Amino acid sequence: MRKITLALSAFCLLFTLNSTVVDAHASSPSPLYPGTNVAKLAEQAPIHWVSVAQIENSLVGRPPMAVGFDIDDTVLFSSPGFWRGQKTYSPGSDAYLKNPEFWEKMNNGWDEFSIPKEVARALISMHVKRGDSIYFITGRSETRTETVSKTLQDDFLIPADNMNPVIFAGDKAGQNTKTQWLREKNIKMFYGDSDNDITAAHDVGVRGIRVLRASNSTYKPLPMAGAFGEEVIVNSEY
C-alpha cells in the first residue's frame, strides 16, 4: 500500500511540474525581435550601387577633369556646427539658417568640429591621383571671410595645384543655385548627398553621384538615395 501511495505522489508531482512548464511557455511573451538570417542581411535596395573602386575604374583612360563636391554631409559630417547654431540662434527652429551671424561662425572656424567622411577621403585621394581639379560647391551662404577652403585642403591633403577656393552658392527659393557653377566651371562629375545636388548635375548633363547622408545628421528628412536613377556609393554614410 505504501508503495502505491509513493507512486501516486511521484506521478502527481511530475504532472504538476509539467503543467507549470507548459503554462510558463504559454504565458511567455513573443520575442520583441524575431531574429534574422543571412538572406535578409544580404538584401539591398534595388538601386545603382557603386564602389569607389568602380568609379575609379570607369575613369581609366580619361584625361584629368574638373570634379565637384558638395560639402555638408557629403565630405564633412558638419552637424555639430549646425546643432550649435540652432541652439545659439534659434532654439527649436531653422531660422538660424537665415542669420548672417551663424554663417560667419560656421564658415570661420566651426568646421573644426566637423568630421571628415572616410568616403570623401577615398574619393578625393583618387581624383587627386588622377590629376583632377577639385571644386567644392556648397549651399552655405557666402561670408566676408572663410576658413572652409583651408580646412578642406588640410583635412583631405589636397595639393595646391588641385585645390580651388570653396564656392558659396547660397540658397535661393525656387532656384538650384549650384547649376550655374557646375556649368561655369565645366564640372564633369559632381558628388552630393541631397536631391538638389543630383538634379543640379542632371540639369547640366553632369555625372551626378550620390553620397549617403549619415542617419544622425541634423539635416532631416533623409533623402531617398537612388530616386533619380543615379549611382549611389556603398558604405558612404561615414
Curated annotation (Swiss-Prot):
Q: Which Pfam families match?
A: Acid_phosphat_B (PF03767)
Q: Which SUPFAM superfamilies match?
A: HAD-like (SSF56784)
For this protein, the record's Gene3D superfamilies field holds:
HAD superfamily/HAD-like (3.40.50.1000)
Sequence positions that bind Mg(2+): 70, 72, 193
Return the EC number. Answer: 3.1.3.2
Q: Where is the signal peptide?
A: 1-26
Cellular component, GO annotation = outer membrane-bounded periplasmic space
Q: Per UniProt, where does substrate bind?
A: 138-139, 178
The broad enzyme category this protein falls into is hydrolase
Q: Which GO terms describe its molecular function?
A: acid phosphatase activity; metal ion binding
UniProt keyword annotations, A-Z: Hydrolase, Magnesium, Metal-binding, Periplasm, Signal
Q: What is its main location?
A: periplasm
- In this protein, the active site sits at 70 (nucleophile), 72 (proton donor)
Give the protein family. Belongs to the class B bacterial acid phosphatase family.
- What protein name is recorded for this chain? Class B acid phosphatase
Organism this protein belongs to? Enterobacter lignolyticus (strain SCF1)
User: Lineage of this protein's species?
Assistant: Bacteria, Pseudomonadati, Pseudomonadota, Gammaproteobacteria, Enterobacterales
